[in-house]
Amino acid sequence: MEKRLQEAQLYKEEGNQRYREGKYRDAVSRYHRALLQLRGLDPSLPSPLPNLGPQGPALTPEQENILHTTQTDCYNNLAACLLQMEPVNYERVREYSQKVLERQPDNAKALYRAGVAFFHLQDYDQARHYLLAAVNRQPKDANVRRYLQLTQSELSSYHRKEKQLYLGMFG
């Protein structure tokens, strides 16, 4: 168990190095490998094969902390990588960012990335929700402010069109 935690951390560090080098596909591969090492160790997730084979020893609180931190970091870093790759898979960015936010609801980077994903998925209400939370945590971040402004603009445009539609129907 300790070996799997260490291997996962090593893969995560390799992923971080690949990210710094701009090798996003390699980084994604390393983060996925890290998560695979952790699969089955997380006591909060149901086992795919319950009561089959010997149960492993329970994780210590320190090991559980390492497990969750490594998982969260990998998901956050996967979302960052995916935003750098063409074409961007915004569904996955959303999914990974929300996994981070399940454990760290105040994670500003995950809030921003979720907002960007929802913006590009054209769910502007959700984008606004996440971007407002991100701007509250990082009020000076120009990227957060820019996406929030773009989202507000799309929402205003949508509401104008909706109003005109209803005026045409009932006017």
From Swiss-Prot:
Placement of TPR repeats on the sequence: 8-41, 72-107, 108-141
Originating species: Homo sapiens
Origin: domain of life: Eukaryota
UniProt xrefs under Pfam families: TPR_19 (PF14559)
InterPro entries named among the record's database cross-references: AIP/AIPL1/TTC9, TPR-like_helical_dom_sf, TPR_rpt
Keywords attached to this entry: Repeat, TPR repeat
Protein encoded by which gene: TTC9C
Name of this chain's protein: Tetratricopeptide repeat protein 9C
Assigned protein family: Belongs to the TTC9 family.
